[in-house]
Amino acid sequence: MKLPAPLIEGRLVRRYKRFLADVELADGSLVTAHTPNTGSMLQCAVPGHRVLISRSDNPKRKLAYTLELIEVAGFWVDTHTHRTNRVAEEALRGGAVLEFTGWQVTPEHTYGDSRIDFLLQQNDRQALVEVKNVTLLCDGQCACFPDAVTTRGQKHLRTLMDARRAGMRAAILFVVQRGEATAFRPADTIDPEYGRLLRQAVSEGVEALAYRTRISPTQTFIDRRLPVWLD
């Protein structure tokens, strides 16, 4: 998926009120950028980190700038959670998610009282797929989710279990945005209930999938499947 162009380089000064970030540009000026991420951005929202921001000319926007990428440990990290589903959809449609090659993709499907990211269909078979954006590393090169307690994420796991019990395929797709990651596991020390529910879901037939992205200042796309560690 192509990123907005051109992107403007700067340094993160601070992230605050969840959706705001102050960025120092190369000329020393300070701008405030929208930060489309509701998580803690642990390891990413660190003052001094190099960032790339985009600028919109839309006069109706409150903030002209948007935080797009943050450099962490020499790798660009895509913290723009609104883009994650589009990257996942592109991968699902293009066959990059091997478990669902050839399935038809419909975004945003309501199941029970939850909105699930994708409904997939193949002949008379149906599958629900929920997508999660992963930007945290634990234990060296293992990607972890979540980076904060997520009751919403817990609810999604319960919904996927309900779908599986009803005879549907169900999967949670962790989109790993850390280029150095070699595996994925739940962040049990941050949200132990999420880890418990994920293991329960897998034991009931929900598929836990992890795919790593390749990110540059011009594009981001899914390119590698990672092992999921639940032990």
Curated annotation (Swiss-Prot):
Source organism, top-level taxon: Bacteria
Gene Ontology MF term list: DNA binding
Pfam families membership: SfsA, SfsA_N
InterPro entries the record matches: SfsA, SfsA_C, SfsA_N
Entry's family note: Belongs to the SfsA family.
Name this protein carries in UniProt: Sugar fermentation stimulation protein homolog
